[in-house]
Amino acid sequence: MLHVSASKGMTEYFKNILDNVKNLYDLAEGCRKSGYDVTDHVEIPLAKDMADRVEGIVGPKNVAERIRELVSDLGKEPAALEIAKEIVEGKFGEFGREVGAEQAVRTALAVITEGIVAAPLEGIAHVKIKKNNDGGEYLAIYFAGPIRSAGGTAQALAVLVGDYVRKNMGLDKFKPTDDEVERYGEEVDLYQSEVTTFQYQPKAEEIRVAVRNISVEITGEATDDVEVSGHRDLPRIETNQIRGGALLALVEGVLLKAPKILRHVDKLGIEGWDWLKELKSKKEELVEEIEEENDEFNYEEEEDLSQYEDYEVEAVTKFIGEVIAGRPVFSHPSKKGGFRLRYGRSRNTGFATDGFHPAIMYLVDDFMAVGTQLKTERPGKATCVVPVDSIEGPIVKLNDKSVLKIDTVEKAKQYRDDVEEILFLGDILVNYGDFLENNHTILPSSWCTEWYEKILKSENLEYTKEFIENPDQKEVVKYAKLTNTPLHPKYTYFWHDISKDNINVLRNWIIGGRYNESNDSWGLTYDPEDPEISIVKRYLELIGCPHTVVDEKVEIFEYYPLLYSLGYDFDEKQDVVEDIEEKLQNTKNNMHFINTIAPFEIRRNAYIYVGARMGRPEKAASRKMKPPVNGLFPIGNAGALVRLINKAVDEGKTDEIEISNVKCSCGNVSLYRTCPFCGSSVEPSGPSRIKLPIKEYWYKALENLKINKAGDVKCIKGMTSKDKIIEPLEKAILRAKNDIFVFKDGTTRFDCTDVPVTHFRPVEIHGDIEKLKSLGYLKDIHGNPLENENQVLELNVQDVIVPESCMDYFLNVSKFIDDLLEKYYKKDRFYNVNKREELVGHLIIGMAPHTSAGMVGRIIGYSKANVGYAHPYFHASKRRNCDGDEDAFFLLLDAFMNFSKRFLPDKRGGQMDAPLVLTTILDPKEVDGEVHNMDSMWEYPLEFYEKSLEGIAPKEIKKIMETVEDRLDKESQYEGIGYTHETLKIDEGPLVCAYKTLGSMMEKTSAQLAVAKKIRATDERDVAEKVIQSHFVPDLIGNLRAFSRQGVRCKCGAKYRRMPLKGICRKCGSRLILTVSKGAVEKYMDVSQTMAEKYNASDYIKQRLEIIRSGIDSLFVNDKRKQVKIEDFFK
């Protein structure tokens, strides 16, 4: 019986997944019981819901059922507090006071974070009961760096939970001394100057107020090698170093999320937090600006905004504060010609991913590939690039001065080398849900066909689909005049981007033209040498009107609506505007003027231009440790720098390393639970230093696998786990045979950028129709039987579409697993696949690096794009959105057979990015709440577009918009999710970002600035200055400092903070090597100065570079010893 609301078809889908999981689990369990692995059972517990995940990750035992009851009755946060209370009361076993308090805090935090992230395990080091100076006992929570993965709200709630536990244990409040209070302030300042900045910069007094009033001690482990200088050696603070975890919980938790804490405190009736109200009132506006960016829309007049009103949108410059070399700026903040804001969701957008016309992806020299991350001005901080070809594409000026609207990929490829300037970048498609999630003001919508169609529908006017999508120019004028409706968006130009006086100048030039009957165009005289004509021609470009320049003539083929917009009646061949000068004087602005002279209403084409710059390039690559290895079998330094065990065997080398081992009764040293020499069952006693019998184990492994000779096999130097238990060498040999690599936990992974998709066409995923039917895809979105590869199907929530390169890698992984089953466990092969399509239907795990819980997925196809397509729910189940982050896929059977907790590093954060528990069925209620804000409509209502002109908060129109939240606990939560904009191919556009294909940094920056130069919305001089200031200068200074403070290393692996007095390695006697080279220090010097000169950077930047140059020269150039000639002495 499933615990989720689902239709019969979805229930069957989930049952199929559960059956397949069980089959794989049983197969792996049988292999484990053979005794050849670290344990005799599969080490990944299965979880059907959040409660199971919590119990599986942090415990205590038998807590899952109670969590379900409490969450059902109370909700998540109250349930977390109640479960913490019951734990300290001993309802789940007797614990010591400190152990019970720690268990309570961990379990409560796990409930709050849905049992997915690693914070409850790794983010809380421990909980102690300590004493105040008056003898009273209080609770201290020791936070660690991985608490960051919980997010600010959960960090704050962890402190709140600690206070609740303290009260239920009858403990006193924490009473800090003045030195302890000031220590926090010193650490916060030091952290921001030496480590990194916080999202919120608190004032010293805010820190004092918080520390004095929080009833538990927020403390933690040392996380950074930076020590305080003032408030040192305090009795109750164990370290003089920065406590990064504690600072995160205090600053980005309690202080930043004060309003949210207050809401929970009031809702739950917890006392002792009233002091937060004072903090909230002092900083609420600043918090909203940082957290919500909700105060950017300002009006010059108090009346509602209309297309005639002047208005001002405050540019958000934060995204462009730092520009990385080689990664272009596509549009400066709110700059004219930038990305035009358009509302809606395509089947491959939403959940922080925005749509762009694929044509612009080619025209910016391939710097926007499918999956490339952009840092954006609004509504969020970042997005992921995906193609949507039903929105407006770019408008460009060619080298021959013609202006062309690029509305197809074919045109983009045809003209890409002839583009002189990109006048308009085209649309950015953003869904309402992203504004709701960021609590960002709903900004005015651009004038688009979907809004236009809603107006026609509301007035019960007749029209055809062809008229909406591609109308005839004469038809739209007649229709607008006849029906008294606004001019069609296709022929509505950017009149608002030039002044009304400029419009009048342009009008006079255009009306002075003549009709060319031979080619049905409107001709204008054009002399490029005439400055006045060049200026007015520029106005024509700036309104985005397509035209062709031929033989010193400008020819306009879409002349009919243009002439009527300017008050010229083409049919009557006369100017119908009277008193034009009076109209210029009496109109408020450009839009008012154009509407006064036109015979129909002309809407404002664009209200909002969105700025953006490139973030990270897309990624699709196998996960490798540094350096890449095939197995977790340690060989110390025997394999030299290349770590090849076969080389060590050939050269007869070995090494002494610390490893778990036991002396077997047969006389041999066994490193495994089953002695490879006699087959006896043994139990390694624990780690100790031994001389590793590499040769014996190598040949025994080859014999066991019946392999005569193996190729190169890379191994690790040593284990970092607690017990130092190793993986069988046979697995490393078989991985090397199949050209795959191992991760720290024994699994083999593939990383790719997260991209959402709710619907797909079989042709996009190389899908076979019959195979898709066997996987449950029987009908398309219109209810028609699946018959051809171009039908649109709704994606099931746990199905994934992997990159082509991932499919190839998984082919190798499947062959490795089959070899392992056959040659090592002596069982039948399982996958038996030889081509990509044969992997369709097999199960994988999806997992994010900051979590400790995996999600079962099913491969249904592959695409050429270097991204991992999955349902937004699937990404949300990993506590991810889709703003450019990357996560891992790995085969489920690989994880069941090869994962072990005992391989994980014994250090803080070692259990992150490991599948400590596996969710088998996706429940939308238990995923990251951000996806609940994603809209699920097939169309936006007319009221939405009208309300957008008022600049209202997104919550104010929530009642007219359907989101995923409205579907929860209904069968429709899994099916029937809509989208507003179609796209032909989800992987249309460049597949590899140019940043990855260019070579040197000089090439990258040259290409970056070439893009900036041809985009109207970008200032290349500002880009050059920002690259130098935010990237090159800090890097040059940092490397210069690192060179002077560097240690040395030896080829044997030894490292020294300072050069030994002997000048050679104390371990092996070899020559020592610098860790920072001269080249590393100088690498950006020449390119920085070249850019500064070429783009005329400010004198300040040039002088700063000169100072850095002199610093480098003083370090590497000996100015006291100079080569001279003998004749110099006779001068």
From Swiss-Prot:
UniProt entry tagged with the keyword rRNA-binding: no
One of the Pfam families matching this protein, by short name: PolC_DP2_N
Reactions mediated catalytically: DNA(n) + a 2'-deoxyribonucleoside 5'-triphosphate = DNA(n+1) + diphosphate; Exonucleolytic cleavage in the 3'- to 5'-direction to yield nucleoside 5'-phosphates
Enzyme Commission number, as recorded: 2.7.7.7, 3.1.11.1
Disulfide bonds: none
UniProt entry tagged with the keyword Glycosyltransferase: no
Keyword terms of this UniProt record: DNA replication, DNA-binding, DNA-directed DNA polymerase, Exonuclease, Hydrolase, Multifunctional enzyme, Nuclease, Nucleotidyltransferase, Transferase
Example GO BP: DNA catabolic process
One Gene Ontology MF term: DNA binding
InterPro entries (UniProt xref): PolC_DP2, PolC_DP2_cat_dom, PolC_DP2_central_dom, PolC_DP2_N
Main function: Possesses two activities: a DNA synthesis (polymerase) and an exonucleolytic activity that degrades single-stranded DNA in the 3'- to 5'-direction. Has a template-primer preference which is characteristic of a replicative DNA polymerase.
Family as reported in the entry's similarity comment: Belongs to the archaeal DNA polymerase II family.
Oligomeric and partner information: Heterodimer of a large subunit and a small subunit.
Protein name: DNA polymerase II large subunit
Biological source species: Methanococcus maripaludis (strain C5 / ATCC BAA-1333)
Taxonomic lineage of the native organism: Archaea, Methanobacteriati, Methanobacteriota, Methanomada group, Methanococci
